[in-house]
Every structure is written in C-alpha cells, then in structure tokens.
Amino acid sequence: MPRLLDSVAVARERWSEAPGAIEVVVVDNASTDLTAAVAEERGCRVVEVQERRIASVRNGGAAVAGGEILCFVDADSQIHPETFIAIERSLATGRVVAGSTGVWMERWSLGIALTWALFMPLVWLTRMDTGVVFCRREDFEAIGGYDERRFFGEDVQLLWDLRRIGRKGNQRLTRLRTVKALGSTRKFDLHGDWHYFSDLFGLLPKMLWSPRASSEFADKYWYGKQRTPER
C-alpha cells in the first residue's frame, strides 16, 4: 500500500485544483498487518469493514467519502500521475457516466500475456476495464453501489449498471488508456502465471451454479482463507 499512497500523492499534486480537495479513504478489511497505521500516518481517512467481501469493502469506503466523484483502486496498484486530471476532463464533457483506466502489469510472462489477451476483446467490446474505476456519487447511489450479493465480479456488475443508467442521458462508459494504473501480479506470483487456464476456468461452471462454491473460492483466492467444513 505505501507504493499506492506515494502514487496518489503525486497525482494529487498534478491536479489543477487544490490537492487537498482529493480525499483518500483506506478501508481496513480485517487486516492483520499495519494497514490502518500506515494509512493514518499518511493522512488518509481509515474505515473498518469486517465483512470479507470486496463489494462490501468498496461500499464501506464510498459511504464515508465526501466527494462528488468516487474513484476505486486496489491497494496493491499504483496510479498514473495524470489520473485525476484525466478523470476530471472525461466527466466534464457530460458524455461519460463512468469509466476505468485499465492496467499495465508490473511484470510480464507468456502466461500473463495470454491471460491479458484473452480478456481484451471483452474489454474493447464493453468498455469495461480494471485499474482505477470512477463515477459520480449520485450515479453510484442511484444503482445502490456495488452488489454485495456477489462474491466476485462486482466491478463488472457496477459498470454494467452504470452503463444502463447512463444510456438514459446519452452517456457512455469510457476507458482512459493514457493513464493506465500499474497492476500487481501478486495473484500470479502466488498461484502461477497460468492459473487462469489451469484452475479458474475449470471452476467457473461450478461457481456459476453454486453460491457456496463461489463463497469458498472467494475466501481462498482473495483472502487465503479456508472455510470450516459443514458437518
């Protein structure tokens, strides 16, 4: 997280308005490290969310944020120095309801590159990407925020819902490709560069039909947690 906060500090300084107008909220999701202490030392607002579900974490941060524009990013990412400038310009056109920056991975291999290539056609087709995801607060609240019933895929559902309400005002999703975030390869480091092909795709049908399987996968993949088997 320190690398993320360093990159946010640079991007705040680049913004044309007062840097202090950009509030940084860090959600402490039952961490066992120094997440909260580091964030507070850096002047961030810290909120605790015990529920280990990414949608709940993001909604918890949005609930205490005071800004009219909301931006969401993972703690192991780094944002581009021009991020806030690009977001402000994009939303100021009035033609954009929400968007994302996309990511450039911090390292590459054949497995990571093929995984990236597999998903890119869907990204191009839908304009839904990862990295820094942003929208107006009023639109976020209009759709009810992130869907907390979902164990994963909450970011896709959020952008899908925002695109739906944007159509009413002739607004669209956008991808800010010139300000890509630097994405962490932590999951590839942990599970292997080919794990999407060897593990995840095989589990997908089961997860789509079984809420318990989805919950168990989310606990293991994002939190490294094994549930106690039911007796």
Residue ranges of predicted features:
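Hydrophobic helical membrane-anchoring modules
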Residues: 164-231
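Short aromatic/hydrophobic "clamp" motif used to bind/position activated sugar donors
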Residues: 70
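Glycine-rich, basic loop-to-helix element that forms the pyrophosphate-binding segment
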Residues: 49-65
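Conserved donor NDP-sugar-binding/catalytic core segment of glycosyltransferases
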Residues: 81-111
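Short, well-formed alpha-helical segments that are part of the catalytic scaffolds
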Residues: 1-16
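Acidic donor-binding/catalytic loop of UDP-sugar-dependent glycosyltransferases
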Residues: 34, 73-90, 160
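A short, conserved alpha-helix in the catalytic core of glycosyltransferases
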Residues: 139-142, 149-170, 174-176
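A conserved acidic beta->alpha catalytic loop
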Residues: 7, 28-36, 77
